[in-house]
Each structure stands twice: as C-alpha cells, then as structure tokens.
Amino acid sequence: MYKIVLVLTLFGAVNGLDKICLGHHAVPNGIIVKTLTNEKEEVTNATETVESKTLDRLCMKGRKYKDLGNCHPIGIIIGAPACDLHLTGRWETLIERENSIAYCYP
C-alpha cells in the first residue's frame, strides 16, 4: 500500500514539472570597479538558470521582448546609428546577444 501511495505522489510531483524556463539571473560577485557614472560599482555576472516553474523575472511566455541582435545596450544609450531601429515600440525585456558590439564615440 505504501508503494502505491509513493508512486502516485511521485507522478503528481512530476506532473507539475512539465514547464521549464531558461534564463539568466544576475548575481553580484564582489568585484568593485570604476565606471563612467560611479567611482565604486559592484560588478555582477549572469548565471544561467533552469527553472521548473514559471518565474516572471525569467520566463518570456506572454512578455513583450526586444532582441537587440548585434546592437549592444550601450549603443542605444549613446545613439549609435546601427541601434536606431531598436528605439521604436514597447517591450518589457531586452535580449542581448553574446556577439553584440559596444560602440564607442570620442
């Protein structure tokens, strides 16, 4: 009898794990750097996460997002011409690609 209850409990637990969300969560790593706006800014690094339940901060289902492609977020802020296309529309989450180019103007 206990085995049957245990098996049914396991099936019930596995049933709730049918949705997996992948994402990144930024965590502070303790390194302090000097930036353009702050003398002492703690650097964060992104940690890849896999979640078995929907977390609003990580999952993209039902959210409006903007894929920046090769444009870096700094390029949008400083007004790089290649990033002008990303100034239109509304979005909740930005997707930054690993191969994005950060533009520097003198």
Swiss-Prot record:
Cell location: Virion membrane; Host apical cell membrane
Keywords: Clathrin- and caveolin-independent endocytosis of virus by host, Clathrin-mediated endocytosis of virus by host, Disulfide bond, Fusion of virus membrane with host endosomal membrane, Fusion of virus membrane with host membrane, Glycoprotein, Hemagglutinin, Host cell membrane, Host membrane, Host-virus interaction, Lipoprotein, Membrane, Palmitate, Signal, Transmembrane, Viral attachment to host cell, Viral envelope protein, Viral penetration into host cytoplasm, Virion, Virus endocytosis by host, Virus entry into host cell
Quaternary structure, from the entry: Homotrimer of disulfide-linked HA1-HA2.
Signal peptide: 1-17
A molecular-function term among this protein's GO annotations: host cell surface receptor binding
GO cellular component terms given for this protein: host cell plasma membrane; membrane; viral envelope; virion membrane
GO terms for biological process, alphabetical: clathrin-dependent endocytosis of virus by host cell; fusion of virus membrane with host endosome membrane; fusion of virus membrane with host plasma membrane; virion attachment to host cell
Gene3D superfamilies: 3.90.209.20, Hemagglutinin Chain A, Domain 2 (2.10.77.10)
The species this protein was found in: Influenza A virus (strain A/Duck/Manitoba/1/1953 H10N7)
Highest taxon of the lineage: Viruses
Note: Major glycoprotein, comprises over 80% of the envelope proteins present in virus particle. The extent of infection into host organism is determined by HA. Influenza viruses bud from the apical surface of polarized epithelial cells (e.g. bronchial epithelial cells) into lumen of lungs and are therefore usually pneumotropic. The reason is that HA is cleaved by tryptase clara which is restricted to lungs. However, HAs of H5 and H7 pantropic avian viruses subtypes can be cleaved by furin and subtilisin-type enzymes, allowing the virus to grow in other organs than lungs.
Protein name, entry field: Hemagglutinin
Pfam families assigned: Hemagglutinin (PF00509)
Physiological role: Binds to sialic acid-containing receptors on the cell surface, bringing about the attachment of the virus particle to the cell. This attachment induces virion internalization of about two third of the virus particles through clathrin-dependent endocytosis and about one third through a clathrin- and caveolin-independent pathway. Plays a major role in the determination of host range restriction and virulence. Class I viral fusion protein.
